[in-house]
Swiss-Prot record:
Gene of this entry: Pde11a
Pfam families in UniProt: GAF, PDEase_I
Protein name according to UniProt: Dual 3',5'-cyclic-AMP and -GMP phosphodiesterase 11A
Phylogenetic classification of the source organism: Eukaryota, Metazoa, Chordata, Craniata, Vertebrata
Primary localization class, coarse: cytoplasm
Organism, scientific name: Mus musculus
Disruption phenotype: Mice live well and have no impaired fertility. They do however display reduced sperm concentration, rate of forward progression and percentage of live spermatozoa. Pre-ejaculated sperm display increased premature/spontaneous capacitance.
Entries under CDD domains matching the protein: HDc
Alphabetical GO biological process terms: signal transduction
Sites where the protein binds a divalent metal cation 1: 668, 704-705, 816
Amino acid sequence: MAASRLDFGEVETFLDRHPELFEDYLMRKGKQELVDKWLQRHTSGQGASSLRPALAGASSLAQSNAKGSPGIGGGAGPQGSAHSHPTPGGGESAGVPLSPSWASGSRGDGSLQRRASQKELRKSFARSKAIHVNRTYDEQVTSRAQEPLSSVRRRALLRKASSLPPTTAHILSALLESRVNLPQYPPTAIDYKCHLKKHNERQFFLELVKDISNDLDLTSLSYKILIFVCLMVDADRCSLFLVEGAAAGKKTLVSKFFDVHAGTPLLPCSSTENSNEVQVPWGKGIIGYVGEHGETVNIPDAYQDRRFNDEIDKLTGYKTKSLLCMPIRNSDGEIIGVAQAINKVPEGAPFTEDDEKVMQMYLPFCGIAISNAQLFAASRKEYERSRALLEVVNDLFEEQTDLEKIVKKIMHRAQTLLKCERCSVLLLEDIESPVVKFTKSFELMSPKCSADAENSFKESVEKSSYSDWLINNSIAELVASTGLPVNVSDAYQDPRFDAEADQISGFHIRSVLCVPIWNSNHQIIGVAQVLNRLDGKPFDDADQRLFEAFVIFCGLGINNTIMYDQVKKSWAKQSVALDVLSYHATCSKAEVDKFKAANIPLVSELAIDDIHFDDFSLDVDAMITAALRMFMELGMVQKFKIDYETLCRWLLTVRKNYRMVLYHNWRHAFNVCQLMFAMLTTAGFQEILTEVEILAVIVGCLCHDLDHRGTNNAFQAKSDSALAQLYGTSATLEHHHFNHAVMILQSEGHNIFANLSSKEYSDLMQLLKQSILATDLTLYFERRTEFFELVRKGDYDWSITSHRDVFRSMLMTACDLGAVTKPWEISRQVAELVTSEFFEQGDRERSELKLTPSAIFDRNRKDELPRLQLEWIDSICMPLYQALVKVNAKLKPMLDSVAANRRKWEELHQKRLQVSAASPDPASPMVAGEDRL
């Protein structure tokens, strides 16, 4: 299908209707060359008077170059008009031209402002592009900001979501995007303020207060304050110093802006390595003195004052003469900054007492505004840090399989959070060992410090000097051994720091922040450290708290990854072990060939269709041939195309996977299967069940006690065995028997269901699971009421799936308990085997678990066996066989045998009672004879 041709006019119309799309595209895709072309086109042939650049974050300064336009005090020019009216917005009122003084860059004292060159405009544009918050007034932006959140915010989020891959990281980033924006108000023009200063000082002062009260951005607020102070006291330049480090007890005065006047952008006056700021120690120099003592300093000639430092003048080439310095206090009276005005205009005249009074009135408002801006900045910083921590959690959940990848993500996040030059992660070789030894180290260098940042991440396997320093880092070893963080502000002044190794490495370390990495068990698994903040300052308490919180999540992520690696190795070991066990747990080829070639006796010869079949009549090999005959007699080999060799191998392997316990062994499994075969063929239940269901119950009977350990489900729960932990406490052994059966079927050459269709296979596996789980007596008690009610009312309909389900469950239980339906000698012998196995479990409960076993498991109460057998028959067996006889009368011989065996147990019980009444001595001959049962 051919793509439709786009019309440029339609695209332009669309962008006009959706300016936010164009803005978003420009900010993401725009290049410097495009900005240069735009500036050249809009400035050529028009002169500088057509430009009205808005300095980012500052008051809107009208810098038109209307030649011949004097200032307010300079007289009227050719274009002056006595009828012109000032406009508070700094623009044109409807039909009224601007006053010449406002259109010019004049300040009211006759001096002209500096013109904004194209280079400066480009720098200003680049700075504004890097700043996320719009600090200049834009009518379109303001109108969009006033739209309801549902239209503006959702549109932006949808646009962002549609332009990014739908990953969890991008979705989370969009959801966590701040919904708080700085208020945007149109500032009044500087020349309008000059007019008010001449004609209405009260309104002039209110305008200055209003402009700073609406600004919550500390950068633009500081710039405004300096411009307005210059304007109030007619200073040539002003500087603002804010107090930092008060919380840590190391106060310093740091210039927010230095040497600014109302018309000059920020001058480069760097005295530090990485920033355009001046740091003044507390109490040093005039600025430090004012900050420490809170006094106003007004000096007519700065060079005559010994506190004055002329280094800045030498650096900038500017001559300081008069100076007015005053503290800025917050609402609590604490000094939060110092404002400095330099060289009163004209020609550096001394500042007057009126200047001091004006500043004293204005600076309290500045203090309140600065406090509000600092509070807002702190809240935004905490928001960004919280957002970063949430993104860290997302990163850790996304990657928990590869240690190198997760450490790389951790270090990238750490550099983003703390803005440092280098980040390192060191992992301990043995977390249990008292000797600290790092086995792995990872490092990441910031792009600012490395031209090849993409290749800076590596695992330190090379013998480089820096890698050696990482592994043998004494500070990291101290943190790993003590579990306490270390924050070194000046590495070369700390005795724990190896300055010689630092010099050899070629990387100059100034400050170090190192914290321990803990796992979920509160064990130290390594350390994380960051080096050298990009701004040259040491890491502060806020950095340390953030890094410690960050490392908590990282520790969990690293620990999970290490655990995953351990689990992966364990899984590999288990796979190898299972492969070895499966080799030894499967039958040999010779055994398979033997039974494959053997003649299988007929059903009549084996007597396996007899309900009263002798459970001990066949040896272990004869039971295999009898099982083969059952499969063939039921037509399952032909119906389901079961490979005969596979069937022989499967039966032999099933036999081999029964343990040599007293009762729940291969013979018991075969006897349960034989009784199921007899009931299917003798009672005609083949007509009730489907062929798939018949196959499921026959296989289920043979597999229903696979790998039985001679203990019941209650013992697994009491001992908190591995089986109980794996399968839970509900039908623990039955789930294990089924899973073991599945494992055998999945072994090579053992899948007797290989030729079934996909649906038949799925149905069969579900039926097989139901059949094996049905042998759990807990499930029998849950379902027998439903079965008994169906039988009592005669409402059963074998065409209904649910009726057949409960019927199959009852058949499985009836076959599992089938020994009680056999002749007395067989039934008593089985009871002795069951009791002996129970007694062994009771002995283990007494010796291993320190518990007193119940009567049926207590060897010391074995004389109570007849009574326990009567309770067993009456509560569990008799009701079941009575219900089955009602379903099919051909099972009446089974019920008769149960009744006959009950009479035998009743006789033994009565004899025991008589003997007990005559002689309470438990060593009597009768009681001793009963012990053999």
